Regions:
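C-terminal motif of bacterial Sec signal peptides marking the signal peptidase cleavage site
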Residues: 37-41
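Bacterial signal peptide processing site
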Residues: 43-46
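Periplasmic-binding protein-like
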Residues: 115-128, 146-148, 186-191, 238-256, ...
Length: 426
């Protein structure tokens, strides 16, 4: 974000969203849910915030364990502080609300209801796998969902969603292409034994098939304290040209690394995607002396060491209030990019004018590219930018980055972005 001024004790931008469920009768609940949708359809309060203030919401799970993303909501507050310290956004003070999504469908729905009740102009830089639960509520109120983490199908199909990355599909397709370039002869993919895991397998196969690379499917439980047998199956006979890609969540990936290290494969190339591990995990597992030394990684954005993130680091330092925020976390980076998109779109919607959700969506749908200072290619959600896919037409950013753990740091393996659009489009 652009800055002008950095007070040591910035004024809070808003109060955290409540996550408790109010006790109402069934009739009252139905009426409460119906009213915002009716009002927004008529251009009522759900469509317009107070003329001197912009309200925005960011949500993510907290207190759930491995799904927690506290850095995303913390960064949202820091960005709000920074914007207000510089005079606000397009002549308006910014009020940032946060909500604990609890990693449940009910929690996601409640957060969406709070956004409607608060007349939020947008939901920005949020994390939830329950798009089927929250998106209908936002759609009914006309509220755009800008820069979600990309965990659910509606984020790439709803006309009210504006994703800033290609989600897991782009990462997996990109990882497959990275392994092809690494000279892999066979690839074992360790992936969750779920429907989502089945989908990931398809994207990976699409990237490997043109090169004639053998793909071995290693299904793994999403939760386990011992992945020894999974690691053994993935490594196999540890012959030259063998590669293993870990496509699990953050916590199971960490649990898999321990038996992988003990097995000490000498010829197998390890690979994964940013989100399954990141710089903080490399540090925690021994850096260059750990199991991730030499590992390949595919990400949405440049590595944390890139100068692209200097402004993010400055925002955290000056406006984060001392709250720990891991700038190598792809969730934090996604929130950062999402707020940059939101900032520019609001400024284009009209400086000093009352800004509505309809006006904001009009800017985002207009097709004029939005620059993110190198964190992504220019982003645009115009019709000509849509992916030719019935399932994920809103997946407009098909670029990934190739990284590698070298000297204990995640660094660029190849400069710039790699486009995997052909793989994703089939």
């Amino acid at each position: 974000m652009r800055r002008s001024g950095s007070p040591e004790h910035p004024e809070p931008t808003g109060t955290p969203g409540r996550t408790g469920r109010c006790r109402r009768t069934a009739g009252a609940v139905a009426a409460a849910l119906l009213l915002p949708a009716l009002l927004s359809a008529c251009g009522g309060p759900a469509d317009a915030a107070p003329p001197d203030e912009i309200t925005v919401m960011t949500w993510a799970p907290s207190g759930t364990g491995s799904a927690d993303r506290p850095g995303m909501t913390a960064l949202a507050g820091a960005v709000g502080h920074e914007l207000n310290a510089g005079g606000g956004l397009a002549g308006h003070r910014v009020k940032v609300l946060t909500c604990n999504e609890h990693n449940t469908a009910e929690g996601a729905t409640e957060c969406a209801r709070q956004a409607v009740a608060a007349h939020a102009l947008a939901v920005v830089g949020s994390y939830s796998q329950y798009g089927d639960a929250f998106m209908p509520t936002l759609e009914a109120a006309g509220i755009p969902y800008v820069g979600g983490y990309g965990l659910s199908t509606p984020e790439f199909s709803s006309p009210f969603s504006y994703p800033v990355s290609g989600g897991t599909p782009a990462l997996i397709a990109g990882s497959g292409q990275q392994l092809v370039e690494a000279g892999c002869k066979s690839v074992a993919v360790v992936r969750p034994d779920t429907r989502a895991g089945d989908t990931l397998l398809g994207f990976l196969a699409g990237a490997l098939k043109p090169a004639g690379i053998t793909l071995k499917d290693v299904k793994a439980p999403e939760r386990s304290n011992d992945y020894t047998e999974i690691a053994k199956k993935a490594i196999g006979d540890d012959r030259a040209g063998s590669c293993v890609i870990v496509a699990l969540g953050f916590e199971p990936t960490a649990n898999l690394l321990d038996p992988y290290r003990r097995l000490q494969p000498r010829r197998t190339q390890l690979a994964s995607v940013i989100g399954s591990f990141q710089q903080s995990v490399v540090d925690a597992t021994g850096g260059d002396a750990g199991p991730l030394s030499g590992a390949l990684a595919t990400g949405w954005y440049p590595p944390e060491s890139s100068q692209v993130w200097d402004v993010l680091r400055s925002t955290v330092r000056l406006h984060g209030g001392g709250v720990p925020i891991d700038v190598s976390d792809p969730g934090v980076q996604t929130t950062w990019v999402a707020y940059e998109v939101f900032r520019q779109a609001v400024e284009r919607a009209g400086n000093g004018k009352q800004i509505t959700t309809k006006a904001l969506r009009g800017v985002l749908d207009g097709g004029e590219p939005i620059e993110t200072a190198g964190a992504t290619p220019p982003l645009s959600w115009g019709l000509t930018n849509m992916l030719p896919s019935a399932d994920s037409p809103r997946l407009v950013n098909t670029a990934v980055t190739f990284q590698r753990v070298q000297g204990g740091r995640l660094v660029e393996q190849r400069a710039g972005f790699v486009d995997v659009r052909k793989v994703l489009a089939g």
